[in-house]
Amino acid sequence: MSIVFQIALAALVLFSFVMVVGVPVAYASPQNWDRSKPLLYLGSGIWAILVIVVALLNFLVV
């Protein structure tokens, strides 16, 4: 179970770095807003799910 927690935590950290770079770039480019908006919503949803998964795994591991 500890390995699954570590993989989920690493995925959350890496995805957070991607979002830190990607979200400002998406907001700064108005010409692609129609195409960027669904990707932002999808990315935000994936990030929120990863946070919940890491929290649940942390509860089970500790």
Swiss-Prot record:
Give coiled-coil spans as residue ranges. none
Q: GO terms for CC?
A: photosystem II reaction center; plasma membrane-derived thylakoid membrane; plasma membrane-derived thylakoid photosystem II
Q: How does it sit in the membrane?
A: Multi-pass membrane protein
Gene disruption phenotype: Grows slightly slower than wild-type under photoautotrophic conditions (40 umol photons/m(2)/s), grows less well under low light (7 umol photons/m(2)/s). Does not grow under photomixotrophic conditions (low light on glucose). PSII is normal, oxygen evolving capacity increases, the PSII:PSI ratio decreases slightly.
- What Gene3D superfamilies does the record point to? Photosystem II PsbZ, reaction centre
Q: Where is the protein situated, by its record's location annotation? A: Cellular thylakoid membrane
Output this protein's name.
Photosystem II reaction center protein Z
Record lineage? Bacteria, Bacillati, Cyanobacteriota, Cyanophyceae, Synechococcales
This protein's gene is called psbZ
List the Pfam families hit by this protein, alphabetically: Ycf9
